[in-house]
Amino acid sequence: QQMYRDGHVNRREFLAAMGALGVTAATAGSFLTSASALASTPTRGGSVIFASNLHGPDDTLDPILGTSTIDYTRANAGCNGLIQVWTDMSLHGELAEEWSVNSNATEYTFKLRKGVTFHDGSAFSADDVLWSMNRHLGKDAPSSIKGFFAAVVEWTKIDSHTVKLSLSSPDADMPIKLTQFQAKIVKKDTTDFSKGAGTGPYLVEAFQPGVKSVHVRNPNYWRDTGQHLDAIEIMAITDPNARLNALLAGDIDMMTVL
């Protein structure tokens, strides 16, 4: 809330950040209406400490393996998807600049954004999309949302920045399914996710599963919005009373589950 008052984020970015951290729209709205001043022009700077309600040794920076709120938060900090949903529930292209669908919703074509780089400086391309999305396919896939993609026949590379998705049956909801955090795009052939493997607004500075992670602003992020904070620390306080007391004492800035 203080970041909003001080102009580090605007209304849309504040609501988006709260949503990424698992805070409901109603709760986020109450923060906004209680703020003493509304920020018209966001400024950069500051940091946030966010406390989730659970964590453990299975905490992961690999989006496809994520199952918890804390995994969700870290995936949103470090990665982008093909499509994203805004706080007004409308769908917009993210790593996909645009997409089209045939008349019976069995074939989607995605035009990918150019000039995007991963955190290690390598260029994002169609190869990364195919590798990331193919990880969801098959009965032995590690994905917790592989059922969403049961009708996928194949992902096809048309050119370096165009991919086609072919389905065995109509699915008009596929764009919504692609907004799931497990469907974030990661660099092709990544095996070590401890330093992150995404194109997102924040780099991984430190990651200790079951303890905390620290994320710092990506200086080469392809967007000019969505990363006004210098750093985000993500941890968990499993006891609800301790979590609330930490918030009231100012030891943390945000939390899930009152």
Annotate each language-model stretch with its function.
Residues H8, G29-L54:
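C-terminal segment of N-terminal export signals and the immediately downstream linker at the start
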Residues G45-L54, E107-T109, V129-S132, V163-K164, ...:
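Short, well-ordered beta-strand elements
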Residues A51-S103, N134, A197-T199:
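N-terminal lobe/hinge region of extracytoplasmic solute-binding protein
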Residues V85-S90, D171, I176-E233, D239-N241:
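Gly/Pro-rich hinge or "lid" segments in bacterial periplasmic/extracellular proteins
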Residues K111, I145-K187:
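Surface-exposed binding/hinge segments that line
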